[in-house]
Amino acid sequence: MPKFKGPGLSVLKKKIRDNERLLKKENLPANIRVEHERALLGLQEQLSMAQLEHKKQKIFERYKKVRFFERKKAERRIKQLEKSLKDETMDDEKRKQCEKSMRKCQIDLMYIKEYPPLTKYVSLYAEGTSEQTEETRNRIWAEMEERFNSGRKHKIPSSGSNRVPVQEKSSTGGDLEDEFLQR
């Protein structure tokens, strides 16, 4: 996962503190006050985005090896099942069983690749886990299964993603004006 681009957390916090100190002065001209208030809002937004990216990065780095080994295990199992499905001498019952296993492995792979980025990773193949861990794993696996069945992908950005979901504005033919121009 690439590092977050832009100023670091400490730089942003320092700029925010500087702006807040400046805004505490009572004899500040109105135009400068407005300018610094706007800058403060922008810096606070940047800080929250940087903190979110920092948290994503930290979680990604912590579970990188576990996810790598689980992904390899799932890919290896899929490859084995594909090879066995190519065998034409297999009877129908075994073929259905292989197809069912293949579907499960594909959902496992989707679980590993598209796990929610801001939550601690719950291993698929771990043994001897608590009830809460089992419940979390089953809940996320069921969500991935639903997405797999419907063909939807990337509802949640993958943990390797460096982007935060952005709400898109619905653009119709005449609504191309910007908020800035309306003021």
From Swiss-Prot:
Region of interest (Disordered), ranges: 148-183
Protein name according to UniProt: rRNA-processing protein efg1
Organism: Schizosaccharomyces pombe (strain 972 / ATCC 24843)
Biased composition annotated in UniProt, kind: Polar residues: 158-173
Biological processes per GO annotation: maturation of SSU-rRNA from tricistronic rRNA transcript (SSU-rRNA, 5.8S rRNA, LSU-rRNA)
Family to which this protein belongs: Belongs to the EFG1 family.
Key words, A-Z: Coiled coil, Nucleus, rRNA processing
Pfam families on file: Efg1
Lineage of the species this protein comes from: Eukaryota, Fungi, Dikarya, Ascomycota, Taphrinomycotina
Chief subcellular location: nucleus
Source superkingdom: Eukaryota
Assigned GO CC terms: cytoplasm; nucleolus; nucleus
